[in-house]
Amino acid sequence: CEVAYSAAKAAVIGLTRALAKELGPSGITVNCVSPGVISTEMNAHLDQEALAALAEETPLGAIGTPEDVAEAIWYLSSDAARFVTGQVLAPNGGLVI
């Protein structure tokens, strides 16, 4: 259901920002990853035509992979992101610009 999914995603973003403010003074960073269209079971019901249309809407012209999301998570959990908190990293190929 699109409504439930969208509401839950918005809640996670709000929780991320609130926790970042609350836990920042303790040196704890809180971020979230908000992927776009990714080639997973969630989209398995879509036919090739629908997937091609989604890819075409994306400025990079492709559907993301689970590896794209994993790389975003890796970055946020690495020392490279030690000064990043309260952010939403969106590996979405530019779909949401």
Locations of regions flagged by a protein language model:
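A short C-terminal helix-loop "cap" of Rossmann-like NAD(P)-dependent dehydrogenase/epimerase domains
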Residues: A44-T58
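Short, flexible catalytic-loop segment of classical short-chain dehydrogenase/reductase
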Residues: I13, V30-H45
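C-terminal helical subdomain
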Residues: C32, A55-A80, V84, P91-G93
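Alpha-helical segment proximal to the catalytic Tyr-Lys
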Residues: K21-P25, R82
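Active-site helix of classical SDR
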Residues: A8, T16
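Short, conserved catalytic or interaction motifs in soluble domains
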Residues: P25, P35, S78
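Conserved catalytic loop/helix region of short-chain dehydrogenase/reductase
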Residues: C1-A4, G27
